Structures are given as C-alpha cells and as structure tokens.
Amino acid sequence: MAAKINSLAALVSLQASHHHHXSTPFYFSPFSPHLSTTLTSRRRSLRSAVVAQSTAGTQSKAPSDVDLAAVSGQDRLLKVPISNIRNFCIIAHIDHGKSTLADKLLQMTGTVQKREMKEQFLDNMDLERERGITIKLQAARMRYVFENEPYCLNLIDTPGHVDFSYEVSRSLAACEGALLVVDASQGVEAQTLANVYLALENNLEIIPVLNKIDLPGAEPVRVSQEIEEVVGLDCSDAIHCSAKEGIGITEILNAIVKRIPPPCDTAERPLRALIFDSYYDPYRGVIVYFRVIDGTIKKGDRIYFMASKKDYFADEIGVLSPNQLQADELYAGEVGYLAASIRSVADARVGDTITHYGRKAENSLPGYEEATPMVFCGLFPVDADKFPDLRDALEKLQLNDAALKFEPETSSAMGFGFRCGFLGLLHMEIIQERLEREYNLTLITTAPSVVYRVNCINGDTVECSNPSLLPEPGKRTSIEEPYVKIEMLTPKDYIGPLMELAQDRRGEFKEMKFITENRASITYELPLAEMVGDFFDQLKSRSKGYASMEYSFLGYKESELIKLDIQINGERVEPLATIVHKDKAYAVGRALTQKLKELIPRQMFKVPIQACIGAKVIASESLSAIRKDVLSKCYGGDITRKKKLLKKQAEGKKRMKAIGKVDVPQEAFMAVLKLEKEVL
C-alpha cells in the first residue's frame, strides 16, 4: 500500500514539474502547488493521476471529433495570444433554440463532458428550465482548435425576453461579435429585431444562423430573405444548422474564429474591467463577473470600483468554464470572475468599472445605464409573521438582480409588505414565483401599476406609483403617465384584430409596413399602464400565437387621469383605490362594485358599495341585509304589537349601520385585485 502511495506521489510530482518547466505560461492547473492543500484536494489530484496513468496506454483507437475537442480544466486555462480570443453572445427570440445551441457548443468543444450534460446547461434555475427561458445571464469559456491553432471562445449567454433587455445590454458591452439565431420555420420576431439594433449600435460583427432546419416546416431561403429585408444583413453566408441534431455546429465554431474580430491589445494601459453581472455567495461574498477591457488583473491586486469608490483585494480570480476555474492573471479581452470578500452588492454595481487602486484609469467605461423599474406592485405575506422573512428574501434576490427595487409599505387591509419595482410583467412573475418557491412564502400581490408624474400647484413634481399617495385634486395641476412605442410583427390575417386591440388600449397609430408579402409590422404609441394588464395575452390570443411584440420607453405625456376610490358603508378602502383614465372610470367602477357585492358577506344591515371620484359617486351596488324575523313569536293578536317590534328592529339596524364596520374578507381583496389586473 505504501509503495502504491509513493508511486502516485511521484507521478503527481512529475506532472507538477512538467507544468512548471513548460515554456507556455499556464494558469492554475489541478496539480499546482498554489491550490489549497486540503486532504480532499490531494485525493482528487491522486485520483486524476491514477485515471490519467491507467488510460494513457489503452486509448489506441482513432479519436472522434468530440474526443479531440474534449479538454480538461487545465487546458481551458491555457494562455492564448489576444489575437486568438473571441468574445461573442447569442441573440435570439424566445424558443428559437438559443439555449440548445449553447449546450451543443459546450459539448462540441469538450467544455462540458457528456455525462455532466443536461438540457439548457447554462440555465441554472429550475424556473428557467420549466418556462424554457433564460433569466440570469451566464458565461462560459471554451477552448477550440482551428487549423492547429488553439482559440479561446468566451460565450456570454443572454436572455431573449423583452423584460430582460437590460441583461442583453450587459452582454453586448462585453462582446465583439454575436450569433443571430433565427428559427427557420418562424422567421424574424420583434424582440430579435430590437436586440439586433442594440448589437449594431455596439458595432458587433453579426453572424446569421438559421436554426431548426430539420423541422418539416423550415423555410431557410424565405427566412434568409426576411433577415436581409428586415434587418439589412447579408445572408449569403448564413449558416444553416440544427442545434438539436448537432448539424452545422462545426461551421458555427469556424465562423466565430474567422469572422468575429479579436479584442484590442490594450494590456499595457491602466486596468479597466466592465462588471456585467454579479451574484451573492454566502461563503465568499459578492462574486463579480467582468470583462477586462484594458490592462491586466492579478490575484492579490488591490482593486478600486470607480462608481462606488470602494477598494478591495482580489482574493480570487479565474475564468468561467462554465464552472469557476482559478487563475493567476487575466489580460485585456478576457472574461472572468472575481471574489474579494465584498459584503454588499452596492459596492460592486453592475456596469461599474474596476481599476487598480494604485494606478487608476482616468475615465470609467462609457455608455452604461442602470436598469429602471417600469412596473410596480405591492407584495404582502398572507401570514403577517412572515414579514421579516419576505424582507430577507427580497434582499437576497436583489443581490442577484440589479433591477429589483423595493420599499416597505403598510396597508390597513393587508398589513405590512413591500412596494416592489420590476422591469416588466414577466420580471414581476419570475420574482413572485422565486419568492414562493425558493423561500416558501405565500404572497398576496396588488394590481400592477406604473410610475406617474404629478405636477403640483406649488411647482413641485412628485413621482407616484401608489394610488393612495396621489396628491389631492386641489393640490395638483396635471398628471403625466409613461408612454411606450410598441412594434407588433404579425401575419397579415391578424392585422385587424391587433389594431383594434391597440386602439382599445388608447393606442395612437404611427405606421404600418409590410416586411414580406404575408407579414406586417404595426407601430403604435400607447400608455404603459395599458400594457401591464393582459395586453400580451390578448395579443397572442387574437393572433392565435403568431404575432410578437417589442416595446421601448418613449417618455411621459400628460393624460386625463383620475383616482378611483371604493367606499364600503361610507368608508374608503385604500388598498382597492386605483388610478384610471377618465374615459374608463365608469366601466372599471361598475366592474369593481359588482365583484365586491358578490364577495362581501351579508350583514345585519344594508351595505352600500360605491365607486367614487372625489366626492362624486359614479357606480353603486347595495348589499341587502340579512332578514331576522322578529314577528315569529307573535301569534295573531294586536297589530300594534307587531309594529312596535318592527320599529324597534329598524332603530337597531339604523344604530348598527352608523357604528358597524364591514370587514372585507381576504378572498374579496384577492378577487378584486385579480379583476383590477383584467379590467385596467
């Protein structure tokens, strides 16, 4: 046994000395003496050595392409010249096969072994796999040999949904090129178009890829023409592939090497690195994902964050392959991660620039904006005792999500909760589902609203996302609401229903153009408040799922908006108040009062349910009283006895109505909130 251990130790020593004397500079290898010398690490090293020794003499068969591509962690850490680095992302609409293509690239380059492979490898959250979407940005470093030259390919995975366009902008800022993946059976979609324009603004080299060519309905020639007409890209050399079947993957890898330019060689300049993502690790603090734009960063360097003006020591740096592999040094053009015992994510904001503390860069990296929440709603725990748990859960989610904003809110009906800001409706759904799934919370959500600007008589401008905080009519001159420009791509058969939908939502028609003979692009300007309900569901329903949409924020416009209050037995119920357009006030008020009449339990007295604008009642329903038969004990006799009993009952009901309070049950609140989401 001792002899066996000695021979293994000698083998490890020989391997380590081989790497130490190699002329090519290496990052950390599994045998590096700089790695942790814990017993577990030694065992792993010995096990790796045994496997290497046992398999070295047995593989005499000709290796396949995947065998040739399969590389160990230490090979992926090999230093390559900056001219052999390629940073790229994948632009695609939802369900056009982006995550499947990313999986195949990881598999073909040997970055992920076949036994570790699972569908949507870069989509770490169960929620991402279930919904088939990418939410959080991921990155992976791949090693690819082309014409006997090793290349380092950094893939930065991006989400495709309109709500997560801020994630896309992070990715594009860290890349030189992009794969434009379009479903060969569906063609160009609206969100793809928006991301392509973002990529063109960033001067990225775009490679068109027509995916799903194995489907019976695939029309690569038609889709190529569509891309040329809509986007203006030359598709004569577009790559035809099927990520699912593995067709055309080698051509894509070769095109990345040949067509995407390498990063600029600026290693001699002062360090500037762009933070494009971060997440919180309970043991190591905030882990920062970054792209080195200028200069070099080494392990142990004292670094400085230019926006937050905080400094730290880089305890650990490395690359994402896609799991973290430690490195000694990262150069200009490379993508990696950093751990520096950062306790607060506010010290390492997304979009911030990392530089050296002793040799600061003159200017931070330009053109980066912080994500702004567009949709707000209240989140309240069903169990009031869970309020601290909800706060902790939101704080943890905020560490990973730069766009999530929240502040405490109190409601007479629902107790303590938070007013939360989101990028859009999908973002709101994802956060709610993660709170319920990952933190075991049961939540009540209020109807989503947007941020209104209120111009007051004294000249102040107040931003208001909560109807209960809206200044009184006598104190304000006007209310402005956010407007968006919406572009819908649809087959020509559904133009009528979609135009009707947009006009019903106070949309202002701008233009319509035919992209191809059968597909049209319709542009409208409409209030964001009209979109935060069921607009997207209606768009899909009226077009039988064929239409897609993309929107961008335009600015604020003055509108005739009013606050609609709900009164129950003469008392206003603030959580049910909402801000609506004057023309829709009656319809919304009528729907809310009718719903409340169905849901509030009957009382011993008559209960009026009213929808009001200020002091004016615009819709009303009455909840009739429960009848108590006070005459049941009277058997004939004098009528005055009956009259006396009825008069006494009427007086009692009158007194009860004056002092009685009507409790609105939780179910009624939830049903009305659901109704508000539908009718607004």
UniProtKB/Swiss-Prot annotation:
Record-level GO BP terms: positive regulation of translation; translation
Q: What residues does the transit peptide encompass?
A: 1-51
SMART domains the record matches: EFG_C (SM00838)
Please list the residue ranges annotated as the tr-type G domain. 83-264
> In which compartments does the protein localize?
Plastid, Chloroplast
- State the Gene Ontology terms under molecular function: GTP binding; GTPase activity
The catalytic activity, as recorded, is: GTP + H2O = GDP + phosphate + H(+)
The record's section on NCBIfam families has: lepA, small_GTP
The UniProt function text for this chain reads: Promotes chloroplast protein synthesis. May act as a fidelity factor of the translation reaction, by catalyzing a one-codon backward translocation of tRNAs on improperly translocated ribosomes.
Instruction: Output this protein's name.
Output: Translation factor GUF1 homolog, chloroplastic
Q: What is the lineage of its organism?
A: Eukaryota, Viridiplantae, Streptophyta, Embryophyta, Tracheophyta
